[in-house]
Regions:
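Short basic/hydrophobic patches in alpha-helices and adjacent helix-turn junctions
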Residues: 65-68, 111-116
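Repeated loop/turn-to-beta-strand initiation elements of outer-membrane beta-barrel proteins
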Residues: 71-73, 115-124
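C-terminal outer-membrane beta-barrel translocator/porin domains of Gram-negative envelope proteins
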Residues: 1-77, 81-92, 97-98, 135, ...
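Outer-membrane beta-barrel "beta-signal"
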Residues: 113-120, 138-149
Length: 149
């Protein structure tokens, strides 16, 4: 699955609420807003001054395989493996406190457990980040609750 986005403006700059943000919903293995340009004091990011600014361009490719776990079907469990690669870049106006790398493609791999429950499908993702920037925020576990129509 491939997903991308591009913001363009004829006048002015993008606002932070218009920009794209990447995290576990689009790219597994990373925290919400965990990838992309950051506002950091003196171009040094720490846990207390590491605000995500979003980006005007993004691209993500997600590869996934789902398979049975070899247990009875009435349990509603299956497994999966995934590999995600993506990037978030570009800000129209940059000040000296913005830190980011334009061409740095982040990568994550992991395993998933899918569980069909009466409240809806649950998905447990266990991730390992293969490539990231020092200021990115990653996560090793993610739980997704879906609905069925």
């Amino acid at each position: 699955e491939f997903e991308s986005g591009l913001l363009t403006y004829t006048t002015g700059n993008s606002r932070v609420n218009d920009r794209f943000f990447l995290g576990s919903r689009k790219m597994r293995g990373f925290d919400a807003g965990g990838i992309g340009p950051r506002e950091c004091s003196n171009r040094v990011c720490s846990t207390s001054n590491n605000d995500a600014l979003g980006g005007e361009n993004f691209a993500v490719a997600r590869f996934e395989a789902e398979f049975p776990l070899g247990i009875p079907d009435e349990y509603g469990l299956s497994g999966g493996l995934f590999y995600d690669i993506g990037n978030l870049w570009s800000l129209t106006k940059i000040n000296n406190n913005v830190l980011y790398e334009d061409g740095s493609w982040r990568q994550a791999i992991g395993a998933s457990v899918f569980w069909k429950t009466p409240i809806g499908p649950l998905r447990f993702n266990f991730s390992d980040v293969l490539k990231k920037e020092q200021y990115d925020r990653d996560e090793s576990f993610d739980l997704t609750i879906s609905t069925r129509f």
